[in-house]
């Protein structure tokens, strides 16, 4: 988990960990930008990562708010494992979450619950 957190912190810090630059800001921006073309059919239940998201380099990237049932901010990005592991980074909220839950049958329930609890706890 600690390596994942350091990676997420590096992404949130636009390529830096502590005082060390690992990748440039431009690389982070490129990785977290949508690279799907306009011809990709996203209006299907089989489209992963889901409505409101595009796809960057290894991440689902939220392009719109109000479309996805998942709480979050425009520009946040995430990815998940089959059995329930999950992380997301929300630059607007300066937020990183890494969850190493293992529950194939309840993974979406736990992911939604975690997101709801985290975003409800944010005080503006």
Where are the regions that the model predicts?
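Catalytic loop of the DD-peptidase/beta-lactamase superfamily, centered on the K-T-G motif
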Residues: 1-124
């Amino acid at each position: 988990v600690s390596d994942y957190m350091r990676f997420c912190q590096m992404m949130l810090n636009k390529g830096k960990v502590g005082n060390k630059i690992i990748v440039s800001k431009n690389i982070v921006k490129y990785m977290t930008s949508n690279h799907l073309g306009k011809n990709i059919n996203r209006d299907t239940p089989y489209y992963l990562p889901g409505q409101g998201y595009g796809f960057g380099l290894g991440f689902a990237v939220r392009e719109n708010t109000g479309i996805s049932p998942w709480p979050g901010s425009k520009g946040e990005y995430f990815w998940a494992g089959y059995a329930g592991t999950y992380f997301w980074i929300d630059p607007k909220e300066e937020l990183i979450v890494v969850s190493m839950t293992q529950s194939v049958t309840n993974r979406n329930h736990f992911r939604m619950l975690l997101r709801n609890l985290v975003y409800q706890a944010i005080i503006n």
